[in-house]
């Protein structure tokens, strides 16, 4: 299991900002902006990263993005925010349980790096 599995099972504490039956959202412990929240599916179902997505994952992928919008609104990010999914070694993915980064609260730059 990954660290996210332990966060879902409450073995490891986190600062939860949103939770429903499918998605858990919590503050990143190394924030890259004033607001930095991770959104994860509660059930991994083989979805370790976006490249591993299959047709059966369409609903949860959409749910993650819609939940990111809900959390952004809850966090007051009306002026904008960034959504990031790091995928695979070259994408700097560090935990192999798909997760969405919601980053905001400051002016973002482009290109990101």
Curated annotation (Swiss-Prot):
Homodimer. It holds the Pfam family HIT. Residues 3-113 form the HIT domain. CDD domains: PKCI_related (cd01276). A motif (Histidine triad motif) lies at residues 97-101. Disulfide bonds: none annotated. It comes from Brassica juncea (Indian mustard). It comes from the Eukaryota. InterPro entries: Histidine_triad_CS, Histidine_triad_HIT, HIT-like, HIT-like_sf. One of its GO terms (molecular function) is adenylylsulfatase activity. This is 14 kDa zinc-binding protein.
């Amino acid at each position: 299991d990954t660290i996210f599995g332990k966060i879902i099972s409450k073995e490891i504490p986190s600062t939860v900002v949103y939770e429903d039956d499918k998605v858990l959202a919590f503050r990143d412990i190394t924030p890259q902006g004033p607001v930095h929240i991770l959104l994860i599916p509660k059930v991994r179902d083989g979805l370790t990263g976006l490249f591993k997505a299959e047709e059966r994952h369409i609903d949860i992928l959409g749910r993650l993005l819609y939940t990111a919008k809900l959390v952004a609104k809850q966090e007051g990010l009306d002026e904008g925010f960034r959504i990031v999914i790091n995928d695979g070694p070259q994408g700097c993915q560090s935990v192999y349980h798909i997760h969405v980064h919601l980053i905001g609260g400051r002016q973002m730059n482009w290109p990101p790096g």
